[in-house]
Amino acid sequence: MTSRRSQEKSYAEAAAAPPPKEAASSDVTPAVPADVIYKLLGFTAAMVVGPIGMYFITVNSGASSTVAGITAAITANLVLFGYIYVAWLDDREEREAASKKKEKKAQ
């Protein structure tokens, strides 16, 4: 007959086991602020609608398709540079706020 092992943990097993995890805090704030998402969606729409719209406006005004393509490419680049500029301004504002916070903490 085989012997049964008790269901309780031995002292060595209990000491080696990791401590029970505490409940995680219920922080439900989004990782990315909503205004950043709205800006991204706006520039995405501008990147889709702007160049295509400029292409068809240019073609319908009597210009060649080559000129219309160049106009669409320029429009896409303007939207891209606009997004980069807005992102740079947001980042600069965040860095200034963080430096002010550090200054205030140091005092």
Curated annotation (Swiss-Prot):
Q: Where is this motif: Prevents secretion from ER?
A: 104-107
Query: Which cell locations does it reside in?
Result: Endoplasmic reticulum membrane; Endoplasmic reticulum-Golgi intermediate compartment membrane; Cytoplasmic vesicle, COPII-coated vesicle membrane
Per the UniProt record, which residue ranges are transmembrane? 40-60, 69-89
Q: Does the keyword Nucleotide-binding apply?
A: no
Stretches in topological domain Cytoplasmic: 1-39, 90-107
Q: How does it sit in the membrane?
A: Multi-pass membrane protein
Which Pfam families does this UniProt record tie to the protein?
Answer: VMA21 (PF09446)
What processes does the entry annotate via GO biological process terms? Answer: vacuolar proton-transporting V-type ATPase complex assembly
Q: Where is the signal peptide?
A: none
Could you list this entry's UniProt keywords, alphabetically sorted.
Cytoplasmic vesicle, Endoplasmic reticulum, Membrane, Transmembrane, Transmembrane helix
Question: Which residue ranges are recorded for the region named Disordered?
Answer: 1-28
Its function, per the record, reads: Required for the assembly of the V0 complex of the vacuolar ATPase (V-ATPase) in the endoplasmic reticulum.
PANTHER family given for it?
VACUOLAR ATPASE ASSEMBLY INTEGRAL MEMBRANE PROTEIN VMA21
Annotated protein name in UniProt: Vacuolar ATPase assembly integral membrane protein vma21
